[in-house]
Amino acid sequence: MGRKVLVVDCDPQANATAGLGIDPSASGKNMYDVFMSGIDGFPRVALGDIIRKTASGIDLAPSHLDLVGAEPYLYHAAFPTGVLNEALADVKNQYSYIFIDTPPSLGQFVINGLYAADHVIVTLDSGSFALNGVTTLSTIFADIKNDLGKEIRPDMAIVSRWGEGSRQGCETEERTDLFTRIFHIFHKPPEPSVKEIQDAKEQKKEQERLLATLAEIRKRFPSVYTVPYSPAVYEAQKRGMPISHFAPDSSAGVVYKAIADEVMKWT
């Protein structure tokens, strides 16, 4: 959309880094060096010193597996929660949007990201434990309010891979195969087997669970999006490109475009 965007990857798994086409194992300064800058005895590395351009036009502050080793040191920093916020101060006026990617596990990187953020988007998958993650996050939000005085209210939830493993929300050739549809008009399909009947019952039960989970999530977030499972997402990741550049008209790409439109209304 022509906006200048920075992605700050604070997850040691470095999926955002790899997803934007940068090899996480490549040499060079990364977020480990930025976080360690606040520790006595380590060299000063500003966030601007590690930012790299990516093929999509998005700027990236890359992560590295070494970032795992930085977390124990953060507890000894003068203000552990504000290390990232202080680092962002040098570059935030250069960008329209800065996205902070945090790990899925609890710790200083998540708290640093939440403290630095103006808005919070919670990403969930459609698995059975999605609501457990929401409950845990609510506890973190309350702790940050009590300890730091900052109230955090998530603006949006994104449920990804919606319908994975079932026909719901899944892009398949079967849905668009005109020959198959015509064939079934003139030929009665065979009676389903016992296994097919059982599979259909299990699929229905899973869809009911998904809808019940989604209803609970909608109660807790002002805005909720479900991103359908799409092979295009994984192809985009392998090529190091955002879905908006690789397959914007895919089922997932259309939803992410709607998400981007809403996010742009926040400022």
Where do the PLM segments sit?
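P-loop NTP-binding core
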Residues: 1-267
